[in-house]
Amino acid sequence: MEKEEKSNLIYDKDPGYVWDNKNECEGAAEETYQELNYEPSISADKLTWTPTRLAKTVFNTYEDDDDFNVLCYFTDWSQYDPRIINKEIRDTGGRSADILRLNTPDGRPFKRLIYSFGGLIGDKKYSADGNASIAVRLGVATDPDDAIANHKGKTIPVDPDGAVLASINCGFTKWEAGDANERYNQEKAKGLLGGFRLLHEADKELEFSLSIGGWSMSGLFSEIAKDEILRTNFVEGIKDFFQRFPMFSHLDIDWEYPGSIGAGNPNSPDDGANFAILIQQITDAKISNLKGISIASSADPAKIDAANIPALMDAGVTGINLMTYDFFTLGDGKLSHHTNIYRDPSDVYSKYSIDDAVTHLIDEKKVDPKAIFIGYAGYTRNAKNATITTSIPSEEALKGTYTDANQTLGSFEYSVLEWTDIICHYMDFEKGEGRNGYKLVHDKVAKADYLYSEATKVFISLDTPRSVRDKGRYVKDKGLGGLFIWSGDQDNGILTNAAHEGLKRRIKNKVIDMTPFYLDSDEELPTYTEPAEPQCEACNIK
């Protein structure tokens, strides 16, 4: 696991974290690798537990005097790493992402931070008691019975400790006693919401949004949307949160998925129509500090249709955060990209693309392009026992298969590596070459990259600075609203820098020169309106 000692992107060993004037986790990542016998050149089925702190923070800042925005989902579990406070723990770990990394000089890397996620009282699919005990801890309900009887459908943070009590990686240097209900407000909060407050105090123009739901917590949406009492409770819960945290000005509803199957959530053909009623009720509430409502939408055209997006826009939705990732997940034995811009329609291996989804929204649903935001990913999708039938090295369209969907290499969950893992163990962007036997391959048809090792037979589909810059250029060429990252706690800056540079923004404060990371000598890649290179006719690239 050799690394360039003078790298501008990564430390040569885990620097640890200073807590209560002590650093008891310096070198913890390396101790974890040793404990688990993790070796990137041969490991195909292990979790690495690689923390974000191994990556150096290199966010540049850029002029943002155009009509595009770059947004950031930031997760409420990203601050944790038990190795920081217990030096006996080395066989597991956490992301250890410091929210104050985003407090950059001379501007901000993101227009808006999106707190992810608020849960729902009464969601017994997520929590056996429907988050009732959490509602009591936060002072929203007097007891569990009251929570379910009178507050079902309201949104609350589902981890009070991480949301308003934690200190580590949230901008606070020591533990202070306090109950969650006492700190569940902007003035007194610690935790991630307290960290958001610190960022707000440093930059009054930085926007904040609350995202409700997500993959794991969408189980109650269908019931809420169809029930007048629960809709009212839902709106009252939003009011309560925005009163407690007036720095928030935007709302994001991440229902996965209205009218379609998500994580086994209840759904109905009436979800789309009911969703529009729910949005209208939020709009009619006229919450004083609520300036915009976005939805997180699947990039699958069938799910877009079921969500009733034109009616949602009419009811008050101002932005669509198109989840243009996870196109590849394990299941059918065929390799494909997980966040590609284009797709060859004749390719039976790939099902989705950014361009397919954007075109469907604009041409079929008549959505204003400025309301559409596309996502870039700080994580990968992987497969093992993979065989690539495209020749390597090559810039041809990806074709390949895999035969094992079990326990594939990942950082904190199987088959998913996070950005710090990539730059530490699998790709050296400063040298422009793979690490530990992996090779980076560019698919010119899809405008996407992947890593592959002949030794481990592991396939890694990922975003790179090159692919994210292409996404920025796509946004600019199509006149979309902008881009967002899932998730900002995974990126050390070079993916987000690439998004800004794809939008052709002028740099204000340079922390790092991005030029080498694009892995080409052509500073101006071909535009999509007038390609300067041969394109696959089947891809409908115009």
From Swiss-Prot:
Optimum pH is 6.0, in the intact toxin complex optimum pH is pH 4.0 to pH 8.0. Chitin binds at Q186, E187, G213, G214, W215, S216, Y257, M323, T324, Y325, D326, W486. Keywords: Carbohydrate metabolism, Chitin degradation, Glycosidase, Hydrolase, Polysaccharide degradation, Secreted, Virulence. Toxin complex is secreted when grown at 25 degrees Celsius or less; at higher temperatures the proteins are present intracellularly but not secreted. GO terms for molecular function: chitin binding; endochitinase activity. GO terms for cellular component: extracellular region. Disruption phenotype: Cells with a disrupted yenA1-yenA2-chi2-yenB-yenC1-yenC2 locus are no longer pathogenic in C.zealandica larvae; chi1 was not tested. It comes from the Bacteria. It is found in: Secreted. It catalyses: Random endo-hydrolysis of N-acetyl-beta-D-glucosaminide (1->4)-beta-linkages in chitin and chitodextrins. Residues 68-506 form the GH18 domain. Semipurified toxin complex consists of at least YenA1-YenA2-YenB-YenC1-YenC2-Chi1-Chi2. The Yen-TC:K9 subcomplex is about 26 nm tall and 22 nm in diameter with 5-fold symmetry and 5 copies of YenA1, YenA2, Chi1 and Chi2; the chitinase subunits may be solvent accessible on the exterior the complex. The Yen-TC:K9 subcomplex has no insecticidal activity. The native complex with additional YenB, YenC1 and YenC2 subunits is 16 nm taller and is insecticidal; the toxicity-conferring subunits are present at about 1 copy each. Belongs to the glycosyl hydrolase 18 family. Part of an orally active toxin complex (TC) with strong insecticidal effects on larvae of the Coleoptera Costelytra zealandica, Acrossidius tasmania and Adoryphorus couloni and some Lepidoptera larvae. The TC has an endochitinase activity. This subunit might aid infection by degradation of the larval peritrophic membrane. This is Chitinase 1. It comes from Yersinia entomophaga.
